[in-house]
């Protein structure tokens, strides 16, 4: 019973880390979106903390896939006039958007992993 309680506590602490990771990504983007390189630098620091915590080659793949696919989707949407960004560097999107999409992908992947560990499946 004590083992289960300790494991449950660990999983909830992991979920808390994931939420802090996502909230920091959002707050840094809101605060520094006009200072593109500062935003990129701070978001990369958050990304590195996430990757160090999760330590998985799959997380790196998820980040790269999310960064590329998410940003590509935004470029297509901008190209068709769906929306625009207040600042843009390449193809209508700011450089920090790559990191934001990658962080979002890692966050959703890790939340799915934690929910699976807690028994929320099928």
Name each model-derived stretch:
Residues 2-122:
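Aromatic-rich, lipid-facing transmembrane alpha helices and their immediate juxtamembrane interface loops
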